[in-house]
A protein has these predicted regions:
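Positively charged n-region of N-terminal signal peptides that target proteins for export
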Residues: 8-14
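Sec-dependent N-terminal signal peptides of Gram-positive bacterial secreted proteins and lipoproteins
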Residues: 14-30
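Intrinsically disordered, low-complexity N-terminal segments that are enriched in acidic
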Residues: 29-143
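Secondary-structure boundary elements
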Residues: 149-215
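Hydrophobic/aromatic-rich core segments of domains that either
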Residues: 224-288
Length: 304
């Protein structure tokens, strides 16, 4: 016991200090873990938005740059934030108190309807056709499979720049610019009935009619192709817009003169004639036909 007699008081103080430190850690472990994940880890990984990031904020999806989720709403908002920034791979953590995190991730991945709504609120170039999740303890890593390749984006940007330079001038009002783009799509795009029938009957079809590539390159498209094409051109002109979708259809919602108005180019395309029935109309008007119903929860700020 020589060492104890020699170091007596110092050793006792050391043991007490170690005991206090361990007690403090286990008592406040959750807060400490979250602190280091949120501050230390976040300081070393920054996700910058790409050229197609949209600086918007909505009722259903809100930007959340945190790397820690505490509930399912946090997960959806983090997903929206990093998909909107164009990220193809990103990770975040479940908070130490979030016991249902793995269950909620599995639930979202098994029924992707909530996640797919994100596509309506981001630039079409940042939209995706599939998403995967890898769970490693409390770390969640997502991989995004985008709708548009880099070569498609370059080709579309070249075409869109040409369309706008040849058809839009600075003297036009916002409504006039939208009308020009609306009419351009009608005159230069044909609805692809063959593709629509194949999809309806679960027949594989590798054409691009569901994308802007179909509308602007191949001049054959279904509703999602018309809608993406108009959305991309509106974003090029810095005109705020999103998409609205239900199980059977998708169309554009455009912010004009401080009001959100609907435009459905697909149903305005009657072949050789231009129809304006669904051009910049309010919600009551577009819902009257019974074909344009949508989730009032997801699109809550656009009901009137």
């Amino acid at each position: 016991m020589f060492w104890y007699n020699y170091y007596g008081d110092d050793m006792r103080r050391y043991i007490i200090l170690v005991f206090i430190c361990f007690s403090f850690y286990f008592c406040f472990k959750v807060k400490i873990d979250d602190f280091f994940q949120k501050n230390f880890f976040y300081n070393y990984i920054k996700y910058e938005g790409n050229d197609y990031y949209l600086d918007n904020d909505f009722n259903y999806f809100k930007e959340n740059n945190s790397l820690i989720a505490y509930n399912k709403e946090d997960i959806l908002n983090i997903l929206y934030t990093f998909i909107n920034k164009g990220c193809e791979n990103f990770s975040f953590y479940c908070g130490s108190n979030y016991k249902d995190c793995r269950h909620d991730i599995d639930e979202l991945m098994n029924d992707k309807s909530s996640i797919l709504y994100i596509n309506d609120f981001v630039h079409p170039y940042n939209s995706f056709h599939n998403i995967s999740a890898k769970i490693d303890k409390n770390k969640i890593t997502f991989k995004i499979f985008k709708n548009y390749s880099y070569s498609e984006i370059n080709e579309l940007n070249y075409i869109i720049k040409k369309i706008i330079n040849e058809n839009i001038n600075v003297s036009m009002s916002v409504r006039e610019k939208i009308k020009v783009l609306h009419n351009y799509l009608i005159f230069n795009t044909e609805y692809d009935n063959d593709y629509a029938n194949d999809i309806k009957n679960s027949i594989p079809n590798d054409k691009n009619s569901y994308k802007a590539t179909g509308a602007l390159v191949n001049h054959l498209a279904v509703c999602s192709g018309y809608t993406d094409a108009l959305s991309i051109m509106l974003n090029y002109l810095k005109i705020k817009n999103i998409k609205i979708s239900n199980d059977n259809h998708v169309w554009n919602l455009i912010y004009v003169d401080n009001v959100w108005l609907h435009t459905d180019v697909t149903n305005d395309d009657l072949g050789s004639d231009v129809n304006n029935r669904y051009f910049l109309v309010n919600t009551d008007t577009i819902k009257f036909d019974g074909k344009h119903n949508f989730s009032e929860n997801v699109y809550s700020e656009f009901q009137r």
